[in-house]
């Protein structure tokens, strides 16, 4: 499988992709460079596909990749409900795409490049 190295060693690249995928699931949009967005798109689409399957093996594969971070905290009937990124993936994000076969993300190019190095910036969001 072909992939971009992104100027990092394999452990750093994998950690960065895991973190950015988790942030995309939690916030449903991130601002990043174009090349990073194209790589994160691949992993995010795979995680959403696992979420659509919803079986135990899919949950375990997704749990091995998505970081265990708090995605949402709210109150329901005198109890505080804390939802992790993995729970949000399986209960909120994946059911939204049950009738869609792939293409869960969208890349929108920003008009202004990054200030320091003029890297092309994009918004990666869930459709």
Swiss-Prot record:
This is Large ribosomal subunit protein bL17. InterPro entries: Ribosomal_bL17, Ribosomal_bL17_CS, Ribosomal_bL17_sf. PANTHER family: LARGE RIBOSOMAL SUBUNIT PROTEIN BL17M, RIBOSOMAL PROTEIN L17. Gene3D superfamilies: Ribosomal protein L17 (3.90.1030.10). NCBIfam families: L17. PROSITE patterns: RIBOSOMAL_L17. One of its GO terms (cellular component) is cytosolic large ribosomal subunit. It comes from Lactobacillus helveticus (strain DPC 4571). Keywords: Ribonucleoprotein, Ribosomal protein. GO terms for biological process: translation. Part of the 50S ribosomal subunit. Contacts protein L32. It holds the Pfam family Ribosomal_L17. The keyword Repeat does not apply. Belongs to the bacterial ribosomal protein bL17 family. One of its GO terms (molecular function) is structural constituent of ribosome.
């Amino acid at each position: 499988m072909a992939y971009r190295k992104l100027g990092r060693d394999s452990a750093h690249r994998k950690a960065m992709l895991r973190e950015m995928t988790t942030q995309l699931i939690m916030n449903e949009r991130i601002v990043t460079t174009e090349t990073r967005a194209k790589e994160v798109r691949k992993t995010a689409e795979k995680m959403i596909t696992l979420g659509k399957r919803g079986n135990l093996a899919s949950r375990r594969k997704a749990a091995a990749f998505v970081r265990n971070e708090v995605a949402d905290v709210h109150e329901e009937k005198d109890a505080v409900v804390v939802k992790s990124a993995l729970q949000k993936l399986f209960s909120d994000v994946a059911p939204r795409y049950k009738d869609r076969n792939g293409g869960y993300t969208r890349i929108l190019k920003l008009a202004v490049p990054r200030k320091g190095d003029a890297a092309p910036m994009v918004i990666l969001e869930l459709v």
